[in-house]
């Protein structure tokens, strides 16, 4: 699930899901992981991260996305300080951090694989990373996709399978 509280959940998905400050603790009684999509848009305050760490058992895992400034604005270049800041902010989660997701824009294509390789090489080796690509060439079963997979293998990074071809089959309604 992409969040641990939702306005439609009380008395539905969780039979006795109250609106409260301990929603994460209640969520963690039913699920053992959560994707924190919000870190793509903004970074949480340190006190919130500490509260999250204290709200779940040791076997619970958080998955967070790298911030969009890292992935979309800088496209993985010249963002060492932002990466360090985000990883430092999540330090209170320690062993509860499951995966850091690297969601790349469709404009990040095969010509930028060397940038991805350098970025992954600079990350702490103990960090579990998953990469989501959206450029169509990475789904064409050709040399570009093979090259991407080789980069991921070399850096022990996972690949998120989000085949975007269906998103691009209809007309653009910008």
Pin down the residues of each PLM region.
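Residues lining hydrophobic/aromatic ligand-binding pockets adjacent to catalytic sites
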Residues: 1-174
């Amino acid at each position: 699930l992409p969040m641990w509280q939702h306005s439609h959940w009380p008395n539905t998905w969780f039979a006795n899901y109250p609106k409260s400050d301990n929603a994460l603790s209640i969520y963690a009684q039913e699920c053992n992981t959560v994707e924190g999509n919000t870190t793509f848009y903004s970074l949480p305050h340190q006190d919130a991260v500490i509260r999250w760490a204290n709200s779940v058992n040791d076997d619970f895992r958080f998955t967070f996305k790298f911030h969009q400034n890292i992935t979309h604005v800088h496209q993985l270049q010249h963002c060492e300080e932002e990466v360090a800041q985000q990883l430092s902010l999540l330090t209170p989660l320690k062993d509860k951090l499951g995966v850091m997701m690297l969601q790349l824009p469709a404009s990040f294509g095969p010509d930028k694989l060397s940038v991805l390789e350098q970025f992954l090489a600079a990350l702490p080796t103990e960090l579990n990373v998953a990469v989501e690509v959206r450029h169509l060439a990475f789904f064409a079963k050709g040399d570009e996709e093979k090259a991407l997979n080789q980069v991921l293998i070399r850096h022990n990074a996972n690949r998120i399978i989000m085949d975007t071809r269906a998103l691009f089959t209809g007309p653009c309604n910008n």
